[in-house]
Amino acid sequence: MSLLLRTLPLRPTRFLSATAISISNATNFFVVPKRTNPLPGTRRTFSSSPVAAASGDVVVKPVPSPPSVLRWVSRTELCGELSVNDVGKRVHLCGWVALHRVHGGLTFLNLRDHTGIVQVRTLPDEFPEAHGLINDMRLEYVVLVEGTVRSRPNESVNKKMKTGFVEVVAEHVEILNPVRTKLPFLVTTADENKDLIKEEIRLRFRCLDLRRQQMKNNIVLRHNVVKLIRRYLEDRHGFIEIETPILSRSTPEGARDYLVPSRIQSGTFYALPQSPQLFKQMLMVSGFDKYYQIARCFRDEDLRADRQPEFTQLDMEMAFMPMEDMLKLNEDLIRKVFSEIKGIQLPDPFPRLTYADAMDRYGSDRPDTRFDLELKDVSNVFTESSFRVFTEALESGGIIKVLCVPLGAKKYSNSALKKGDIYNEAMKSGAKGLPFLKVLDNGEIEGIAALVSSLDSAGKINFVKQCGAAPGDLILFGVGPVTSVNKTLDRLRLFVAHDMDLIDHSKHSILWVTDFPMFEWNEPEQRLEALHHPFTAPKPEDMDDLPSARALAYDMVYNGVEIGGGSLRIYKRDVQEKVLEIIGISPEEAESKFGYLLEALDMGAPPHGGIAYGLDRMVMMLGGASSIRDVIAFPKTTTAQCALTRTPSEVDPKQLQDLSIRTK
């Protein structure tokens, strides 16, 4: 019988006749003693004895107990932990029917619990009632199986299963809860067909989705990562875990806040925390030397594959710890996690790149260094060029950088470079075009005629040499403001690396990016804003020119993804007030929104710093998942909705009235 048919619910059944039917003529029936008024909680099951039904008994179809009867059963073993050491042992197992098949007059099912799967078989001659009930089961029924562990026949051994050398012969079976509706997808084959099952269906029926082996592995992996982190920080370094408030206050900078109206203080609002930043700084002022928290954070922002409106981060803060000690402690922690969880050995120490070097060489502050494709600045080649597009860009303060793609001349045709996927990738970054040149086998270059003709023979040789190009290579240009050029070439670099399979997936690229600028220019608002956050300390040597200062900030980047970021903090009030002033926060606004922080800095705040890791993102990368939604038990969709509970939702008008809220 097909797996699909096995998922269909049984039809409603009824009592048949008071006349006894022998087991030999009705192996699909079982017997319970006849009662006019069954006692509450009566166990509606059957005996494993092959004795025929006695006269006066009531014969019923093999259906579970009535809905009003709830049974709590115990088990002696777990399905995935049985082995040859258990042969001969009588066991009680509970779980879900993962597979059901009939072969040679015998019925087999795979019984699944959180530890794994074990095969259960029937012996119709010895235990006909158990055979009859199992024969009519459907996938995902919740059942109790009592039986004896036996070794599988040699021809039936399955070395791919952890329990593949044993099976359980069912002597007594009870259906604890049947499936009464058609399943939206098959759990058993869902891992193989994951790409065919729409994610909205998986999220809508998350309880089924989480039964899949891959999803279970992801959630267990997450648990193991958190358990290891807790053990390491507490036992090795003396950290203590402290919870910080969820109901906090809205602060400027960063993403939009989720607001919570106050009923008691009408017209006022709490904000859900985007991070525990200021609270953990308060803890350092309070004298708690080493703090950490597995913190829930909330940001009302546009979503991508690695973003959620509510997410979890590993949050840490330490007092009296210079930057070198801070980086070493975190390197040791991450090496421990990768080594114990995945067996990956990371370098000691981690490589470092300054922000300026990362942007110059890769066009990104989170570079993936598993492949080369470094960018080259060739502005000097075109300072006196006759190609006006380039010279005008330089005259307006822009730059010209190139990305040299080895053997890319044949990979990408001229038409692809003018209107294909690689061209579209450049357009997505905001570029107005994609200038390119190709190095021919004879060393000549071809491409945009006006660009080629702007270079004399010596200029061509110098240009090709400066690009590091060879015959057959493709040279892609980024022209314009520094930020725009880096954004375009970073995007093209990643596109080409994936498209040409240049990434060595056996390598693990982890590094620190340091020396970030303190501030960046916000063009729409025409003001400076903090690149990280306004509580980051500047480098001491840059204190005389704070608007241009570099920050004592550091980001940890793994395979091109930022997995953690932190900084040393400002711990003196006058410096903090100056930074807030630079980003446009007046003294009055600073006192209103950050008065408690400024007061604390005047009460003996120690030098301190910290870091936060995106736990969801870290587990996603350790587990090889494509989205953080696959490592969160109950995630939100890309439209910030919970498909399972259908939230957000409308609320009772009375609740809004109590909160003095009126909606449009």
Curated annotation (Swiss-Prot):
Subcellular location: Plastid, Chloroplast; Mitochondrion
DNA-binding region per Swiss-Prot/TrEMBL record: 91-176
Protein keywords: Aminoacyl-tRNA synthetase, ATP-binding, Chloroplast, DNA-binding, Ligase, Magnesium, Metal-binding, Mitochondrion, Nucleotide-binding, Plastid, Protein biosynthesis
Ligand binding (ATP): 299-301, 562, 614-617
Residues binding Mg(2+) 3, per UniProt: 562
PROSITE patterns to which the protein is assigned, alphabetical: AA_TRNA_LIGASE_II (PS50862)
Residues the entry annotates as binding Mg(2+) 2: 562
Pfam families, per the entry: GAD (PF02938), tRNA-synt_2 (PF00152), tRNA_anti-codon (PF01336)
CDD domains per UniProt: AspRS_core, EcAspRS_like_N
Reactions accelerated catalytically: tRNA(Asp) + L-aspartate + ATP = L-aspartyl-tRNA(Asp) + AMP + diphosphate
InterPro entries in alphabetical order: Aa-tRNA-synt_II, aa-tRNA-synth_II, aa-tRNA-synth_II/BPL/LPL, Asp-tRNA-ligase_1, Asp-tRNA-ligase_1_N, Asp/Asn-tRNA-synth_IIb, AspRS_core, GAD-like_sf
Single annotated GO MF: metal ion binding
Region annotation (Aspartate) ranges: 277-280
Binding site for L-aspartate: 253, 299, 569
GO cellular component: chloroplast; cytosol; mitochondrion
Keyword Oxidoreductase: no
Annotated function: Catalyzes the specific attachment of an amino acid to its cognate tRNA in a 2 step reaction: the amino acid (AA) is first activated by ATP to form AA-AMP and then transferred to the acceptor end of the tRNA.
PANTHER family: ASPARTATE--TRNA LIGASE, MITOCHONDRIAL, ASPARTYL/LYSYL-TRNA SYNTHETASE
Protein name stated in the entry: Aspartate--tRNA ligase, chloroplastic/mitochondrial
Organism: Arabidopsis thaliana (Mouse-ear cress)
The organism's taxonomic lineage, starting at the top: Eukaryota, Viridiplantae, Streptophyta, Embryophyta, Tracheophyta
